[in-house]
Amino acid sequence: MKQFAITLSVLCALILLVPTLLVIPFQHNKEAGASVESEKTAVSTKPASKGAETLKASPVSIPVYRTANQSVENIPLEEYVIGVVASEMPATFKPEALKAQALAARTFIVRLMVSNSAVEAPKGSLVDDTQMFQVYKSKAELKKQWGTSYETKLKKITDAVASTQGKILTYNNQPIEASFFSTSNGYTENAEAYWTSAIPYLKSVKSPWDKKSPKYKATKTFTAAEFQQKLGVKLDGSSAVGKITGETPGHQVATAVINGKTLKGRDIREKLGLNSADFEWKRNGDTITVTTRGFGHGVGMSQYGANFMAKEGKTVDDIVKYYYQGTQISEADAFLNKYMAKK
């Protein structure tokens, strides 16, 4: 009887203990689950990356002359930069290249805001919307151009602009001449080789990526009569066109002689409407074929070079500091305040 009582006591104890033993593992798993959940929440509430920043309202507006309707439109600075980047660089380019273009576009306009432009804009405006300054298109124009891909492309460009908002490129604490072009011949050009003055941060650098650009090579054909008329020269009776007599630091044509007349490479390019001043020519009877390498003046940042750099994993800092040697990325506030004070 005593043994039965002991056995009964043990069974009762086990009955009370088993639920507790069963619950302990589940409580542990529940706590672990809560831990995982809190980690997920922490990740999802991290500050957005630079590329996903929200575009802030611009306190400064740019008076832009819209050539289509011949009127001046005041456009918030960052909205203007979006319209320029969308117009000047393909939206299919890599985000880091788009960021570099945003920095260049913002720097260009901020520099104009605080200094005198060599090119006069229409009355009441700071710039127009053409390549005379920077090409700009409104969101309505971009929607018409892009169609069904409008939302995707606009978001990509807006993210690039937002990630660089308020930032410009400076040299000696001043906004730089942030020139850019489509495709180099494998080298960028010294500023003084294309314009008149040397600029320390616009020096020739290698840009080997550009050889992969669809705009790297092109040909253009002229009749002998067209060629002579456009350049104001007289071809001799030989099979030769002329002789290249000088080369720039960027390996473009500096000078050429045609039947005793010396011409600048830039003038030849502009008068013949060539893609670049790196050219060679060939005469076949009454036909002259000119082959060019590169697209644009070659000074500053190569857009296709920037995109290929981005594809290799280079950042916006890498890109702009490579093409604009010795420059810094700085806040634009001081220059914007100076502009507002003048108004």
UniProtKB/Swiss-Prot annotation:
Q: Does the keyword Signal apply?
A: no
Biological process terms in GO annotation: sporulation resulting in formation of a cellular spore
* Identification of the protein by name: Stage II sporulation protein D
**What's a Pfam family in this record?**
SpoIID
Note the InterPro entries from the entry.
Bact_Sporulation_Assoc, SpoIID/LytB, SpoIID/LytB_N, Spore_II_D_firmicutes
**Gene responsible for this protein:** spoIID
Query: Keywords of this protein's UniProt record, alphabetized?
Result: Sporulation
Q: Does the keyword GTP-binding apply?
A: no
Physiological role: May act at the level of sigma-G activity or its stability. SpoIID is probably required for engulfment.
Please state the span of the N-terminal signal peptide per the UniProt entry: none
Top-level taxon of origin: Bacteria
